[in-house]
Amino acid sequence: MMERTFSIIDFGACSTTDELQTRYIQAAIDECFLQGGGEVQIPEGTFLTGGIRLRSNVCLHLMENAHLKGIRDPEAYGVLEDDVIEPIPNNDRTVKLYHTPTADENFQTYEWFNRAGSRWNHGLIRAAYAKNVSVIGECGSALDGSDCYDALGEEFYRGPHLMNFFYCENITLRGYTCVDSANWAHAFFYSKNLIIEKVKIYAGHDGVHATRCDNITIRQCAFYTGDDCVAGFDNQNVIVQDCLMNTACSAMRLGATNALIEKCRFWGPGEYVFRGSLSLEEKRGGGKPQKIPSHRYNMLSVFTYYADFSTAIREQPGNIIIRHCNIENVDRLLHYNYSGNEIWQKNRPLQSVMFEDVYAMGISMPLTAYGDEKVPLYLTMRNVDIQFAPEDENMDFIHTCYYSMINLENVRIQGLSNGALVRSWGGQGRLIYKNLICDIPKENYFLTSDKSFVCQTI
């Protein structure tokens, strides 16, 4: 039986007009869904649109040089809340708007974040309670978020995501390019079985951000983002393979149980600006700002732990492995700061992380490995070659507290000589080193600090 195909042209869509094409695109998706599923084709051309809803068993196929361009009107993206074919439950709706999170908040105060039918969750392409959905792009296809400004959005300037999925299963995303997403390029919540492959992401904010999702595979993707490349927490079974990661924030801001990041290249500084450093006028105007000193491009870290209180965490985070990777010109290799001054790292602590077969150069800050008294950190570095470009010649290699084990095996450290190999603020576990090559004197391999722990938050 041949798969049903539907062209948006047959439903009235046109690429040679400034008229909004949302209703025509949505009509094609709805008809495909009502007939049992199939493929909706977006032909070559640029189609101006607001939010559209993807439904179960529907593949949105962007043909060669097909572009979906989001309108710069934040009121045009409420498709999920207005839908009559598959109305979302009342308890998944809210009028609560984004507010700046504080350290003492809990799950209940994140209603604007956790409910599919919120303004913050608006997106160019949205799906909720859907199964077997896909977005496939051919050569030259693109999704353009137009840096849509929203004064009611996150940080009072971010607009809709490019894609937003809630309670979905079996999602496949492949082959297209994302540009200028007004918030995250891909936002996933409470979903499972996600495959993102051969996708390119330029500028905007987070590339892929998943919250409470299971079985995520990201492979052969290219991230050139203003914010984190891959982010999220309370995720289980995450694989990131063969990806390029360039950002003005963290390559991985992740909390997960069982995560493998391998065969990736990380490098800074970012090609695109961290948009939070722009002026209000620049945020409103969109577009590509000039490079000036007040704009931030430096890449903050390779791996930053993430665990806030926007959702409960089901399983103990840990078994995170970063291996067979090359790293250049990044401020930090590891940023795990459970000391209490970082609101994004105050939910459940991290149990273990490993770097294996990693080459890094141009690192400018110590590794931070500050664990929890009840769940101390197990840090492994095996077959790691790391070259520092320190701002201070007395810089340490690792800053730590509450660890069960720091295991350094076949590790070569270059560029550090006067500081400590490991400087501890208490809660000592075991330090093991084998075949360690460095210029740090042995009497400085382990030092304790009598000063207050200070760590810049990111």
Can you annotate each of these PLM segments?
Residues 1-458:
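Extracellular/periplasmic carbohydrate-active domains that bind, remodel
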